[in-house]
Amino acid sequence: MSYFVAPFEVSSKSLGAPLKVHFVHLYSAIATRHSDTIDVVFLVDGLKATVAVSCATLAELRGREGINLADQQLADIAALYLRQTLERGYEATEAELFLRGEQLRALGRELGYL
């Protein structure tokens, strides 16, 4: 499968120069990190940044609400979350960013997926 998130730049007063962000890949972290997440990996100025999307939240969306987000939609939601996080001045390459619950739903609604 092939997913595409267009490269983008993020600016923030606290970040200094604009940061260049590139999507790398999306994969299940259960096998690689023993984490119950779907990891969406980006490079932020060449440094790895991971947005970990909660599998429990995805299962809840599918089970209770009948919504099944496609991988491309997850990549888009993760990119928006990373963009917003960087715009607030957070250094996203220092730790994983966890995306779950209402936060994921809000971003999905913002993109028109929910």
Q: What do these predicted ranges mean?
A:
Residues 1-47:
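Short, charged/polar N-terminal "headpieces" of proteins
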Residues 38-63:
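A short, structured beta-strand/loop element
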